[in-house]
A protein has these predicted regions:
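Structural motif corresponding to the early beta-alpha repeats
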Residues: 54-56, 68-89, 109-112
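N-terminal start-of-chain detector that recognizes signal peptides
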Residues: 35, 47-49, 77-81, 133-134
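Short, flexible segments with low predicted structural confidence
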Residues: 33-35, 78, 99, 123-124
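N-terminal binding-site loop/beta-alpha segment at the start of enzyme catalytic domains
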Residues: 1-73
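Glycine/proline-rich, positively charged
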Residues: 26-27, 40, 84-164
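Structural preference for beta-strand elements that scaffold enzyme active sites
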Residues: 5, 13-17, 48-49, 72-76, ...
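Short, histidine-centered active-site or binding-site loop motifs used for metal coordination
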Residues: 20-22, 43, 79, 107-112
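Short alpha-helical
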Residues: 56-60, 82, 146-148
């Protein structure tokens, strides 16, 4: 497996990541033990980057896969919410459900257009605060939209643009 630094974050990840959505309830709906076994297999093959999100409801799979401390993948999670309070809840939920003090990467999820980005100012403020506290290592935006991508690359605090 080849590994690279993720932008200027200092975070090293495998060039192949694992989208955890697939094992959860909205897709394969695997039992937690079975989904965790799939994740451990990916780790054994060298995959060190997991992509998840609050609404995927896949934290139990990841937590189970990490029991025993043998693997320490980089975990990126995302949240659809707009307000500071809701983003804070999402980060704290991830910390609790993943049994981690620090979240590697946290993103605003599926930002749809410029007004959507602006409406999430509270969520963005929260991400910046949690990064400043050292609770989140890197922050950014996930999007399907090129206009959002063009705007996000000019935001100095944005560590990661995650085009979907």
């Amino acid at each position: 497996m080849k590994y690279s630094e993720l932008g200027k974050t200092g975070i090293k990840v495998s060039r192949i990541g694992f989208g955890v959505l697939t094992v959860g309830g909205s897709q394969l709906n695997l039992p937690v033990a079975e989904g965790a076994a799939v994740l451990r297999y990916a780790f054994e093959k060298g995959i060190s980057f997991l992509d998840t999100a609050q609404y995927y409801q896949t934290y139990p799979y990841i937590r189970e896969a990490l029991k025993g401390g043998r693997f320490e993948p980089v975990i990126a999670s995302k949240c659809l919410d707009y307000t500071y309070r809701d983003m804070e809840f999402a980060i704290e939920e991830a910390r609790k459900e993943l049994d981690r003090d620090i979240i590697d990467i946290f993103l605003m999820h599926e930002v749809r257009n410029d007004p959507d980005l602006e409406l999430r100012a509270g969520a963005w403020e929260c991400l910046n605060d949690y990064k400043a506290k050292g609770i989140v290592k890197a922050i950014g935006v996930s999007t399907h939209h090129t206009d959002v991508a063009h705007k996000v690359v000019d935001i100095p605090e944005c560590d990661i643009l995650f085009p979907l």
